[in-house]
């Protein structure tokens, strides 16, 4: 076949063109993303019961839902959060669970639980599929100098959200910063008592004023008429004249006993954009959608959307991920170009021929571009990890070309013609190429069998790299020999390499031969050195600070203001504004948007901070956070937490402000509160941690109404009536629905806030008894002050408290978790108090447990494949003996660069396994051939093989090293994710380049002698 290809050079060139064109077409179709799509199958269930306390929501709504949902197959984690009037249950499924099938099971479970839920719920629980690991791709702000926030929210919900959701690639559009408009009825309790109106009667009057149902039609022989009544009241003015009752010939209207205003459903919610009030829309993408194209489509639609807005409404883009992604990918492309250029430079310097350098110059782009076609077929995207695979592949795919090219060049230098040299050269190294390719491929194919997050995260990297390597094998066997036969010339005709470089390499070659001969005479000492290197590997790995993923500088910060749970919404607003003004003072900040109250809790606020592009600011995201922390003024009752938003966020169940979270669980709620406070206080004292924030253990003030049930029964008052009156008075109860062609709105009933500033208002609340008489609440009850949780959390079916935390500067996640374990041991936490890591920390812990098994599995897989190829149990051990030196180099380089051992560094270690094995395969394969063909002794064969293979070994190592060097030196956006990979490869190759040139021949000889001894022993026994 090779001979036939050599006689068909045009076919080979057209094959290269076909591969390149196929890849180029696929490249234009690939989606763009910062990281591979890692979908955590997650479903969020929401239920509402306006006015219900958090504890009531947890026991009457969350608990029945959890019992039903917890029985669904494939649920890996279940947590719930209950606050005033709302419950949120988060279900996380196993990574291999089909989300659509899970959604059907969730709907069935909700239907099964409906009979156990309270009857007063305004609607059935709803669910939606979410991907909590995915950051929003875009955010818009709606603001107006004249319109209230509720009207802006209405525009966003009824117009913008609908239109945006129709754009291809848009997943979910979420609104925050206010709520839908509502007619708010704020009742004067004194007027109620004066006119003798009961709250339940008032509620019924309001509900009866807004009927909406079929009213029929009239028919005659020739005509038909629809029967209709005037429409529903729409505004506060329409409700002011509502007749509540007639008394003693007088008409009592709503305006006489209540203030009626055009308001919002939830007055404890607000939003902002920089200095102005605003409603914020955050947009996420659909799984697999091209972020760049989706954002471009949104930007293209914005002029039309702005035209739909009133003239006094501004629609502003405040968050756009595309510039950062463009910059990151641009830096990755530059890094790829530098890597290719450096690799070609290595070939030219060693072979000294422009023609020779041109051959891998063709092979590299053919292999890399053709890989895009494989990426497209697998549904991959252009992202940091897949581009890192291509950057590394630039140094690996050239290895095969170098081996073929160097061997053909060697035969040319011996006097063979180009065609004969090409044929003999490729035949000699054909098996070597297959062994090198399979050895490297099996490393990354092994990762695909690990499952879990590691497999999902590195699937694109692994398959992309394996595809490039396999294509490289085809190109090296089918195309490179043909190009060599046409382009290469004997040394007399070719442009020779610079004489100085030739002389230097000749001296190196001579020195290596002499030193190798001396080392072969001290085999035991070299084997002891190798054993020491193995031990040093284990020590350095155990001591290396370990982390999950490198912290990225995305230019997006998240801030969280945690207020004292006893503070009201109005009290917290100026405190939150202090932090907002602080953020806006920093020159690197471009925009800040956020929400106050709402589902976050009355006293809390979330900030989304957008920094200027990296080219326009001097500080990194971490330095901006350090400045904000250092300059944050003391705010009584307020805490400000900050962290850098990441492209990949592991889902947690508590919505903590820190980067990581610890869940504390118990069935005994008082014990849970006691121990969660002790644990969180202990964590605050750990110097390795910062921003420790406990969620769920704080208490807000409560008025506890103690009802004398016997007295209430004597007075003809039942508990249902009491609960209804209290709900009507204090819970922002939605008592009627207003139907509109565009949306549905509510009428909200409550006591006037002017009368609810003191618990004494309870003495003026009246309840209607069974006989129609009005009975003061104080006639059968007393009240006292107490404490209650502002939010109630469950993890699984247990009450839980979440403690969020971040790491101090220079502290790895492993060190932080070890410090927490030590603190827990000192506290002697009892067995009935359970703890569990969540979010990034949980994923890190799982990956850390899997790492040794993953490394062992890769080594076993390599051993088996090499054993099959070489038909020997010993030669694979020789090849594997090269790995310890690479590991030592990688771990030392990480330590010197002060980089933690993260999953990206682990990926670099796997790459090193494949690269350094190539060196041993080149040497051993040639030595075995010399033993078979020329009958040389093992010592002579390995010495000669090492001398003859020195040039390709050095070339392939330098190609890999220089190909990874741009990863180390890159300073642009996204470099913090690529640098650990580059440092690992460069450090490992620098050490292994030197050591393996000596240890491989020694191990080969030792194992060959062992083989001969065993063979002799068997012969004697036979």
Model regions: which residues?
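Juxtamembrane segments of multi-pass membrane proteins
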Residues: 530-631, 635, 657-658, 679, ...
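Interfacial segments of transmembrane alpha-helices in multi-pass membrane proteins
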Residues: 3-9, 287-290, 326-383, 445, ...
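Cytosolic juxtamembrane regions of multi-pass inner-membrane proteins
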Residues: 308, 325-334, 350-352, 380, ...
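Transmembrane helices with small-residue packing motifs
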Residues: 10, 18-53, 111-121, 376, ...
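Membrane-proximal extracytoplasmic
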Residues: 1-341, 382, 456, 638-639, ...
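C-terminal transmembrane helical bundles of large multi-pass transporters
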Residues: 266, 321, 387, 631-1010
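Transmembrane alpha-helices and their membrane-interface boundaries in multi-pass membrane transporters
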Residues: 2, 394-408, 430-449, 456-498, ...
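Signature of alpha-helical transmembrane segments and their immediate interfacial
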Residues: 1-31, 429, 497-549, 638, ...
């Amino acid at each position: 076949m090779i001979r036939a290809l050599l006689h068909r050079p045009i076919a080979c060139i057209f094959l290269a063109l076909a591969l390149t064109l196929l890849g180029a077409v696929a490249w234009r179709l690939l989606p763009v993303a910062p990281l591979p799509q890692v979908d955590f199958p997650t479903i969020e269930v929401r239920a509402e019961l306006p006015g219900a306390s958090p504890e009531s929501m947890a026991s009457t709504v969350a608990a029945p839902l959890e019992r039903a949902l917890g029985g669904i197959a494939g649920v890996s984690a279940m947590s719930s959060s209950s606050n005033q009037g709302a419950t949120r249950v988060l279900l996380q499924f196993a990574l291999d669970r089909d989300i659509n099938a899970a959604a059907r099971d969730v709907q069935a479970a909700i239907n099964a639980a409906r009979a156990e839920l309270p009857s007063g719920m305004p609607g059935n629980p709803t669910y939606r599929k979410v991907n909590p690991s995915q950051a929003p791709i875009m955010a818009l702000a709606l603001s107006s100098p004249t319109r209230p926030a509720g009207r802006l929210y209405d525009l966003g919900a009824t117009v913008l959200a609908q239109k945006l959701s129709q754009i291809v690639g848009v997943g979910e559009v979420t609104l925050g910063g206010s709520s839908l408009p509502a007619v708010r009825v704020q009742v004067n309790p004194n007027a109620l008592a004066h006119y003798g109106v009961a709250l339940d009667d008032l509620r019924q009057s309001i509900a009866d004023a807004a009927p909406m149902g079929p009213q029929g039609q009239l028919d005659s022989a020739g005509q038909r008429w629809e029967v209709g009544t005037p429409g529903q009241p729409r505004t506060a003015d329409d409700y002011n004249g509502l007749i509540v009752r007639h008394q003693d010939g007088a008409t009592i209207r709503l305006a006489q006993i209540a203030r009626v205003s055009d308001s919002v459903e939830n007055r404890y919610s607000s939003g902002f954009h920089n200095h102005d009030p605003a409603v914020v829309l955050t947009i996420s993408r659909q799984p697999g959608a091209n972020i760049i194209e989706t954002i471009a489509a949104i930007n293209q639609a914005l002029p039309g959307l702005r035209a739909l807005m009133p003239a006094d409404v501004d629609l502003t883009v405040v968050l756009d991920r595309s510039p950062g992604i463009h910059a990151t990918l641009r830096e990755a492309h530059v890094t790829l170009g530098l890597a290719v250029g450096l690799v070609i430079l290595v070939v030219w310097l060693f072979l000294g021929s422009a023609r020779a350098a041109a051959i891998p110059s063709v092979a590299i782009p053919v292999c890399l571009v053709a890989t895009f076609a494989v990426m497209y077929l697998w549904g991959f995207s252009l992202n940091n990890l897949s581009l890192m695979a291509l950057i590394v592949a630039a140094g690996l795919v050239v290895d095969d070309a170098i081996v073929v090219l160097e061997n053909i060049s060697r035969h040319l230098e011996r006097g063979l013609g180009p065609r004969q040299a090409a044929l003999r050269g490729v035949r000699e190294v054909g098996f070597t190429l297959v062994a090198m390719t399979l050895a490297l491929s099996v490393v990354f194919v092994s990762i695909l069998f690990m499952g879990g997050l590691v497999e999902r995260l590195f699937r694109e990297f692994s398959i992309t790299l394996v595809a490039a390597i396999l294509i490289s094998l085809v190109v090296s066997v089918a195309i490179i020999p043909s190009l060599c036969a046409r382009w290469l010339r004997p040394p007399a005709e070719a442009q020779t390499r610079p004489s100085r470089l030739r002389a230097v390499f000749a001296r190196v070659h001579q020195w290596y031969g002499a030193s190798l001969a001396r080392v072969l005479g001290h085999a035991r000492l070299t084997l002891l050195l190798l054993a020491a290197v193995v031990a040093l590997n284990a020590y350095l790995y155990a001591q290396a600070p370990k982390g999950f993923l490198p912290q990225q500088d995305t230019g997006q910060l998240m801030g969280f203001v945690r207020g004292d749970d006893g503070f009201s919404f109005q009290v917290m607003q100026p405190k939150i504004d202090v932090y907002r003004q602080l953020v806006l003072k920093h020159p690197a900040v471009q925009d800040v948007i956020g929400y106050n109250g709402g589902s976050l809790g009355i006293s809390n606020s979330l900030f989304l901070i957008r920094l200027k592009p990296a080219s326009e600011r001097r500080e990194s995201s971490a330095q901006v956070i350090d400045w904000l922390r250092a300059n944050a003024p003391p705010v009584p009752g307020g805490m400000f937490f900050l962290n850098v938003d990441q492209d990949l966020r592991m889902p947690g169940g508590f919505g903590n402000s820190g980067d990581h979270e610890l869940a504390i669980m118990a069935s005994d709620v008082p014990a849970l509160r006691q121990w969660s406070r002790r644990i969180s206080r202990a964590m605050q004292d750990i110097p390795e941690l910062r921003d420790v924030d406990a969620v769920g253990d704080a208490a807000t003030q409560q008025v506890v109404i103690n009802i004398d049930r016997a007295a209430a029964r004597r007075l003809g008052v039942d508990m249902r009536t009491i609960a209804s009156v209290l709900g009507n008075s204090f819970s922002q109860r939605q008592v009627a629905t207003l139907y509109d062609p565009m949306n549905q709105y509510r009428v909200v009933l409550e006591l006037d806030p002017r009368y609810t500033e003191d618990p004494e208002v309870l003495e003026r609340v009246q309840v209607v008894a069974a006989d129609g008489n009005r009975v003061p609440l104080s006639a059968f009850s007393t009240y006292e002050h107490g404490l209650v949780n502002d939010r109630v959390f469950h993890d699984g079916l247990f009450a839980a408290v979440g403690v969020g935390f971040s790491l101090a500067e220079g502290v790895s996640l492993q060190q932080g978790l070890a410090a927490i374990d030590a603190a827990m041991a000192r506290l002697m936490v009892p067995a009935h108090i359970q703890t569990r890591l969540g979010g990034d920390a949980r994923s890190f812990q799982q990956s850390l447990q899997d790492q040794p098994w993953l490394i062992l599995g890769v080594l076993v897989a390599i051993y088996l494949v090499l054993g099959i190829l070489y038909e020997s149990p010993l030669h694979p051990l020789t090849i594997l003996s090269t790995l310890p030196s690479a590991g030592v180099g990688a771990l030392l380089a990480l330590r010197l660069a002060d980089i933690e051992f993260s999953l990206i560094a682990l990926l670099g270690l796997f790459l090193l396994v494949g690269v350094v094995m190539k060196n041993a395969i080149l040497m051993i394969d040639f030595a075995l051939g010399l033993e078979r063909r020329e009958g040389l002794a093992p010592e002579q064969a390995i010495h000669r093989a090492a001398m003859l293979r020195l040039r390709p070994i050095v070339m392939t190592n330098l190609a890999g090293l220089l190909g990874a060097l741009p990863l180390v030196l890159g300073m642009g956006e996204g470099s913090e994710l690529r640098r650990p990979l580059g440092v690992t490869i460069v450090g490992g190759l620098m050490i292994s380049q030197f050591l393996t040139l000596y240890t491989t021949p020694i191990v080969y000889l030792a194992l060959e002698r062992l083989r001969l001894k065993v063979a002799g022993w068997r012969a004697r026994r036979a």
